[in-house]
Amino acid sequence: MDALELKNIISDGLLSFPVTDFDQNGDFNKSSYAKRLEWLAPYGASALFAAGGTGEFFSLTGNEYSEVIKTAVDICKGSVPIIAGAGGPTRQAIEQAKEAERLGAHGILLMPHYLTEASQEGLIEHVKQVCNSVDFGVIFYNRSVSRLNLDSIQKLTEMCPNLIGFKDSSGQIDMMTAVTQTIGDRLSYLGGLPTAEVFAAPYKALGCPVYSSAVFNFIPKTAMEFYNALRSDDFETTNRLIKDFFLPLIKIRDRKSGYAVSMIKAGAKIVGHDAGPVRPPLSDLTQADYEDLAALIATLGPQ
């Protein structure tokens, strides 16, 4: 699959970001992860992002990273494209991008570099070097200390033919408006804010109709119901789900830092697809928070 083909795929549909399964010792659980992907695949996500933020990319060792990507590629071959997370320092991101391409992934999501702040010139060079190291498609993740301005994005689209996507987690509506209006269909645009469903309608209005759904990990039926309603401008359904489910979910998520990932793993366990614990420095939900989440999920019915 070339970069343009991947761009067309991620321009439509719901994007799945599966959690990464660990056993009770905190080691990667390959068989459980494989079963998870087999369970989620038939629900109709347009692409699957292995070892992304929700998949605890930041806590995987080099060998584990390779094993996660290889498992995803092997299980989903012929059914759904695999996009791998890759990031951190430039040379590490290049190594991971090359490894993902070698293992048969169809592209990467370029995660933020580590810790340090960087100039726009430095970010341009970082993205350019990663793009130049591979042939497949690269999606830039605009968040945290790794944010490009409009001028930098324009330069990179000219320098890097395989830069195909821009995932935004900044929430800066004016910036996204400028990007989509100026860059146009040269890139595909992905909404990437936590609990992205709440922001999906305004992002769609900006020309960014696609988003990453973390809740697809435990309520795939409802996640697809929401996406299809959004796509058809069924505001009665989207507003009902936001009010009755997503806003209460955010209240649970915001009780502790790191719950944006921990809550997703807890949800998977509640619906019978246990992915094991999160790794430090994240912490699992408290029992009270777990019970509140279980009660909220129960209101949706079977998935």
From Swiss-Prot:
Its EC number is 4.2.1.41. The keyword Lyase applies. SMART domains: DHDPS. Keywords: Lyase. Pathway: Carbohydrate acid metabolism; D-glucarate degradation; 2,5-dioxopentanoate from D-glucarate: step 2/2. It is an enzyme of class 4 (lyase). One of its GO terms (biological process) is D-glucarate catabolic process. InterPro entries: Aldolase_TIM, DapA-like, Dehydro-deoxyglucarate_dehyd. GO terms for molecular function: 4-hydroxy-tetrahydrodipicolinate synthase activity; 5-dehydro-4-deoxyglucarate dehydratase activity. It holds the Pfam family DHDPS. It catalyses: 5-dehydro-4-deoxy-D-glucarate + H(+) = 2,5-dioxopentanoate + CO2 + H2O. Belongs to the DapA family. This is Probable 5-dehydro-4-deoxyglucarate dehydratase. It comes from Acinetobacter baumannii (strain SDF).
